[in-house]
Regions:
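Short, flexible loop segments at the rims of nucleotide/cofactor-binding pockets, characterized by
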Residues: 14, 28-34, 98, 129-135, ...
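A cross-family acyltransferase "interaction/gating" segment
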Residues: 149-154, 159-226
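C-terminal alpha-helix
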Residues: 147, 230, 234-238
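Internal catalytic-core helix/loop-beta-alpha segment
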Residues: 118-164
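Short amphipathic alpha-helix with an adjacent loop that forms part of the alpha/beta core around
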Residues: 41-47, 144-146
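A transmembrane-helix-recognition feature enriched in membrane-embedded lipid enzymes
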Residues: 2-39, 66, 107-116
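Amphipathic coiled-coil/heptad-repeat helices and related helical stalk/stem segments
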Residues: 36-39, 105, 137-141, 167-171
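Catalytic core of membrane glycerolipid acyltransferases/transacylases, capturing the structured
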Residues: 47-131
């Protein structure tokens, strides 16, 4: 097991990383750009385990960092705002996020983000290879399932930052197998404000928005295609 994989299991390591990443990123969300948040009443009071957040995807890192900020703020009793980031003194760390393995190995910074709670999975398709897999590797699926047992998990069903890309059935199968509470999240403005990695500014003064919707009334026994269609509609990514 890689060092980063071992370290992220220690909450104190993740708390320190959250505090550092949070302080560095906060000005970009709140001062350089303008973040608006809605729907945090839908995540307040959720259990600390078996909650799956499904979200559209606009940048590699800024999306996730923003969600982590919000989760920490909600833990401290804030509603639909970040306010002064004193929540970073004791951040909420019962959360993991699914990320492509190749992305998280691409630089020292991405390896640092891995220790903040990344569940690295192999892409179902790699632009540098002719190989195309039909779904998640079984070991990747088990990794996400284990995380859900005691934590929240953030997943991007499209697996890409391309808008209106089709969703992956792996998300639906995960929902069928684990029967989590499913919270749809819609984000906007991040692809305008930041570069693809989400680490550099493209356009300052951009309105960033994050909306948490009510939990999906999922029929866990429905076909995977039906569940996936429900998820994609909820996150505003179904082509009409």
């Amino acid at each position: 097991m890689a060092l980063s994989e071992r370290l992220k299991k220690f909450k104190i390591v993740r708390k320190i990383l959250y505090a550092i990443i949070g302080m560095v990123s906060y000005p970009g969300f709140m001062w350089v750009n303008k973040l608006t948040i809605s729907g945090t009443e839908n995540i307040k009071g959720l259990p600390k385990e078996n909650v799956l957040f499904v979200c559209n995807h606009q940048t590699y890192f800024a999306d996730v960092i923003t969600l982590l900020h919000i989760f920490c703020a909600v833990k401290w009793g804030k509603e639909n705002k970040l306010g002064v980031p004193y929540y970073l003194l004791n951040p909420f760390t019962n959360v993991y996020y699914v990320a492509a393995e190749e992305t998280m190995k691409s630089s020292w910074l991405s390896k640092l983000f891995t220790m903040a709670g990344a569940l690295t999975v192999k892409r179902t398709w790699n632009s540098k290879s002719t190989e195309k897999r039909r779904g998640l590797d079984p070991s990747d699926t088990r990794k996400i399932q284990r995380a859900l047992e005691k934590n929240w998990v953030i997943q991007f069903p499209q697996g890409t930052t391309t808008p209106f890309a089709p969703g992956r059935k792996g998300t639906a199968h995960l929902i069928k197998m684990n029967r989590p509470i499913v919270i749809p999240v819609i984000i906007d403005g991040f692809s305008t404000a930041f570069n693809k990695q989400g680490l550099k500014f493209n356009k300052r003064g951009t309105r960033l928005s994050v909306q948490f919707k009510e939990s999906l009334p999922v029929n866990y026994d429905a076909p995977a295609e039906e569940i996936l269609d429900q998820v994609m509609t909820a996150i505003g990514q179904k082509r009409l």
